[in-house]
Amino acid sequence: MVTKPDWLRVKAPQRERVGAVKDILRDLALNTVCEEASCPNIGECFKAGTATFLIMGPACTRACPYCDIDFEKYPKALDPTEPERLAQAVRRMGLRHVVITSVNRDDLADGGALQFARCIEAVRRVMPQTTIEVLIPDFCGSEAALDIVIAAHPQVINHNTETVPRLYRRVRPQGDYGRTLQLLERVRAKASHIYTKSGLMAGLGESEAEVLAVMADLRAVYCDILTIGQYLQPTPKHLKVEAFVEPALFERWRRAGEGMGFLQMVSSPLTRSSYHAEQVQRLMRSHPRTPKNQHSPE
């Protein structure tokens, strides 16, 4: 059994620090990936008044062996009031940047793309100055579904790569590495004003060279932002941690990513795809993009 090193130990969140955020979420009957996926940074993020909202219910139609979100083949129908409730949470929390993600909903014809668009539009009506990041599923490769999200014009579209190609069958059996790259490439080709983002987990048996190869593949499709963090086994029934990656290697990946041209490169043991996502606002100021002033791929 691999022993968790000291650099991965975080203080348990205290009620007074996270209570206000939890009260808002409970009052508005909203889910967060922070809670559903047992994120180790929940205390820090809730203390700062930030959260990553999980839309379309707490149950997923896929059963990825690394993920702590519950599986259901046929989850509940979508709630038409969810977009407005989410927007009210953003208002009550005073968020300048919001991250919206979802479970996979392969039971829906559009994979939930329209619900993403409705949530984006609701937040924009209530908090027009808030920047919006969406962390989306692959929609089973549907270009039409992706177009629905793009048409809502979030500032950032994130789709996580999760692991290296060699490990996809074991780690992400219902995903496809090529489909992930194609999704990111399509976003950039159709709406170059939208920043694209992806994330990787380390410690599942990948090599340093394999991670660098994935980073190069992501830059080849003009991915702007990359996060890399340590995989942590949520429960004994989930995939085991093969290795706890030293902080020095995360730092090497960070420097390598900057050298490859990622506009933002976040790599550390506790990094998660939405960790300190609000920092993307600095990137937007230094590399501004608007629909009327689209940038060609670098």
Curated annotation (Swiss-Prot):
Enzyme class: transferase
Cofactor note: Binds 2 [4Fe-4S] clusters per subunit. One cluster is coordinated with 3 cysteines and an exchangeable S-adenosyl-L-methionine.
Keyword terms, alphabetized: 4Fe-4S, Cytoplasm, Iron, Iron-sulfur, Metal-binding, S-adenosyl-L-methionine, Transferase
Needed co-factor(s): [4Fe-4S] cluster
Pathway noted in the entry: Protein modification; protein lipoylation via endogenous pathway; protein N(6)-(lipoyl)lysine from octanoyl-[acyl-carrier-protein]: step 2/2
Known catalytic reactions: [[Fe-S] cluster scaffold protein carrying a second [4Fe-4S](2+) cluster] + N(6)-octanoyl-L-lysyl-[protein] + 2 oxidized [2Fe-2S]-[ferredoxin] + 2 S-adenosyl-L-methionine + 4 H(+) = [[Fe-S] cluster scaffold protein] + N(6)-[(R)-dihydrolipoyl]-L-lysyl-[protein] + 4 Fe(3+) + 2 hydrogen sulfide + 2 5'-deoxyadenosine + 2 L-methionine + 2 reduced [2Fe-2S]-[ferredoxin]
Domain Radical SAM core: 46-263
Gene Ontology molecular functions: 4 iron, 4 sulfur cluster binding; lipoate synthase activity; metal ion binding
A Pfam family assignment: Radical_SAM
Region of interest: Disordered: 277-298
Annotated NCBIfam families: lipA, PRK05481.1, PRK12928.1
UniProt protein name: Lipoyl synthase 1
Source species: Gloeobacter violaceus (strain ATCC 29082 / PCC 7421)
Gene from which the chain derives: lipA1
